[in-house]
Structure formats: structure tokens, C-alpha cells
Amino acid sequence: MEQKAVDILSKYRLMAIATLRPDGWPQATMVSYANEGLLLYFIVSRASQKYTNIERDSRVSIVVGRDFEDPAQIKALSIAANASEVRDPKQRERAIELILERHPALARLGRPDLEHSAVMRAYCSIVTILDYSKGFGHADILTVAPGGVEMTPARDDDWGFLSGTAEA
């Protein structure tokens, strides 16, 4: 099941990331990313609200997916993660290379100026894999820990659409 999550991450190139503002309100932003397995890399401006939010509180929520006309085709991820700046020069360089390779338009802009940009990583803690081809509302949950990845049995929730309980 971990490979299914990695496949979805590898298929898309844009994610929504939600951070917590100082006033407690969530702030969601779209960012380009690259991944190595379940480890996500992205670049932000040091002057951005999301950078300030992450420096203050590393907890983030991430969504990866795309719009579908047919709900039965939804395949997406909802992720709880901890984000932080990549400070190790070798890992930072690796992250930049992955991002620029995955996003050629960014590569044409040149390398990020590290005085103004921060290379970030997000360590996934909980990964919910949405796969509605297995049934409307189908979700498998992965818990990622230092010892490995554990899967929680699938949760199916048709939201009342298929059970006849939906109100018109």
C-alpha cells in the first residue's frame, strides 16, 4: 500500500499545503514538490507566511490529487506531516536537483537563492490514500513511523450518496 501512495506522489507535481497562522487560522497554499518515497521536498520564500508558520509550528496538512469528472476515478492523498527546513548541504542540494528535474519551468528560472529561499522537507506521519475506484469514499490509512509503515484497514464511507440517506 505504501507503493500506491508513492505512485500517486510521483504522478502529480503540485500539492496544497496547510500551515497554522499565529492567530490559529489555517493557511493553505499550492506549491510545487518532488518526492523520494514518502519524503516530500518543496521550496518557499523565507519572507512567506508559510515559512514563518512552519518555523513556529512544524505540523502541516498536505493534499495531492486532481479534479475528476467521475468521482469513481478519484485517487488522491491526504497527509499529516511535519515540515522543516533542509539544513544539511548535501540533502539540500539533492532536494533542489529533484525539484528542478521534476519542474523544468522552475529550472529555467535558475537555481534558488538560498538567502531568499528555503528548501523544505515534509516527513509524512499519516497518509490517507483515497481510491474511489474501490468504492465511493474508500480510504486506506498508512501510519509512518521510524520502525516502518503500518496500514489501517480500509474505511469506506459513501457520505450517504449510495445508502439512500442523502437529502435532496
Question: Predicted segments — roles?
Answer:
Residues 48-50, 69, 135-137:
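Short, surface-exposed beta-strand-loop junctions and turns on beta-sheet-rich folds
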Residues 1-15:
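Short, basic/aromatic recognition patches
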Residues 11-13, 26-29, 113-116, 123:
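Short, basic and Ser/Thr-rich N-terminal targeting/leader segments
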Residues 75-168:
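Charged, gly/pro-rich active-site loop segments
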Residues 9-10, 55-56, 100:
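Alpha-helix boundary recognition
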Residues 1-3, 48, 101-106:
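Charged, amphipathic alpha-helical segments
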Residues 66-67, 124:
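Short secondary-structure boundary segments
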Residues 13-46, 52-54, 60-66, 73-79:
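Short beta-strand segments
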